[in-house]
Amino acid sequence: MCLAARIRYLPIDSSKIRFMSKPESAPELSIVIPCFNEADGVEALATALEPVLGELEIDGHELVLIDDGSTDGTFAALESWRTRSDAVHPIRLARNFGKEAAMTCGLHFARGQAVIILDADLQDPPALIPEMIQKWRAGADMVLAHRKLRNEDGWFKRLTAAAFYRVMGVLAGNRVPSNVGDFRLMDRRVVDALLHLPEKTRFMKGLMNYVGFTVATIDYVRPGRHSGQSRWSVWKLWNLALEGITSFSTAPLRAWGYLGFVFALVALLYASWIVLRTLLYGVDVPGYASLATLVLFFSGLQMISIGILGEYLARIFIETKNRPLYVVERMEGFDADWVVGQSSRLVGNVVLPRGYDSSAPPQLDP
């Protein structure tokens, strides 16, 4: 039964729900594509993807396309694509929840034994899909697409990206591969491991690296966007970097403890020197200029440390609210009963389509 329905969330103890197995007709390959204001590029995406998928020797495929609250008619373009292909399954989120949430939504409803995450702007070449599948069948649980060249990015973005990956590796100990984006293939057990991670603040590159498994890599030169421009401003990239570091490392918190000890030691030595110099040589202590400078300096350090504490407290606040990662407004091409079964993978929430008999919920474990 195909479903085109509005979705609502009901709280339920998901730890007591038995996960529903995938339908017998589940495809071997799922491609998850987050979209935000990509109406002009949907047709080009279809033109690039369909020939590649048509030549694959696989037991079926599906395209899970997530419209992350677009305002330009992206979902209408996805619906038009679905009229030409039953493999297309569009999902529209109720608002813009961000790419990390959109990717999680796509993984949540992907049924394939292998799942590929692909950007809608064609900067992730569909031509690499056959090679990814080949490495997966050779035994790799995750196949990463490594950007050998990033000619489409300016020098500033390349420099800051390199700095972020280096800092992330040092502080977090979770060495996220540099020049590797979200474009990758994951085996079903990798996807299931990701879906069992309960945090609401999700830095997907870090989480994908965290779960481990056998990894293979392929190199490629990333082309420019087919249409439009990147929505990743410097401010958004900065916030993503903060999210990545604070999600995987407590080093910034520890650093202020060490820094405080060092400054206290320096202050003690300096105070001892002032006292000894005054007692032994009768040298007067200078005026208030140096004192005012020190006060301002340490006040600045305190403000920075409070800001770092605030970053961690904000993330704790988000986690304790336990809100769903996303809210689905509409979805097409999914079996209603399977959707309800899959909803148990969302910690603390279940998704029910309008009209579904909520008096007969999924079977509970005894």
Predicted regions and their residues:
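Generic recognition of well-ordered alpha-helical segments
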Residues: 44-47, 51, 76, 162-165, ...
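Short conserved micro-motifs on helix faces and helix-strand junctions that flank
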Residues: 34, 93-95, 184, 257, ...
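Residues in soluble alpha-helical coiled-coils and helical-bundle/repeat scaffolds
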Residues: 36-40, 123, 127, 195, ...
